[in-house]
Amino acid sequence: MRVAEVVRNTSETQIRVKIDLDGTGRQKLATGVPFLDHMLDQIARHGLVDLDIEAHGDTHIDDHHTVEDVGITLGQAVAKAVGDKKGIRRYGHSYVPLDEALSRVVIDFSGRPGLEFHVPFTRARIGTFDVDLSIEFFRGFVNHAGVTLHIDNLRGVNAHHQLETVFKAFGRALRMAVELDERAAGQIPSTKGSL
C-alpha cells in the first residue's frame, strides 16, 4: 500500500495530510480555506488518490501560510508514499478543458524540484481567494515532493475555470506519473539507476 501521513506544525500552521496513491478519489478536506478545499477535491477526484487533509492556520491574517504549508505537506506526503520510485511511470501529463479554459500540466518525478507556472489570470481574486497563492501552493509542493512541474493555462477568460483546469490536470498528471508500470516492476525509471 502506498499510503503516507505527514504532520507539520509551525508557529503559523498545524497541518495533517494523509494520502493513498492507489485510492478511488475519496476526500476529507478541512483547510479553513474553502476555495483551496474545492481545488484539493479536484486533485483527489481526478487523480484517483484518497486525501485526508486538516489544517489550522493564521487565516485571520490571510490565507498565505495555510495554502503554502498545505502544498509543502502534501508534497512531503506524496514523496513518502512514492518511496524509492521503483516501478512508477515517473512522467505524467494532462490537458483539461472547462468551457473556454484549457490547461496543460506535465510532471516528472525527477528528484529535481522545479516549477514553471504560466497562468495569465484574468482576475486577482476568485471570491476571497488570492490567485497568487496557487503559485505558492505548487512551489511548496514541488520543493518537497522533489518533482519538476510545468503548468500552462493555454486559454481562459474565467479565472475560476483557469485555476480549476490547472488543478484537474495536475491530479490527472500525478495519477499517470505515480502509476505502477508492470513492465518496469522493481526498476528505477532512470538510466542513472536513481532519482
UniProtKB/Swiss-Prot annotation:
One of its GO terms (cellular component) is cytoplasm. It is found in: Cytoplasm. Keywords: Amino-acid biosynthesis, Cytoplasm, Histidine biosynthesis, Lyase. Its main location: cytoplasm. Pathway: Amino-acid biosynthesis; L-histidine biosynthesis; L-histidine from 5-phospho-alpha-D-ribose 1-diphosphate: step 6/9. One of its GO terms (biological process) is L-histidine biosynthetic process. The keyword Acetylation does not apply. HAMAP family: HisB. This is Imidazoleglycerol-phosphate dehydratase. It comes from Burkholderia thailandensis (strain ATCC 700388 / DSM 13276 / CCUG 48851 / CIP 106301 / E264).
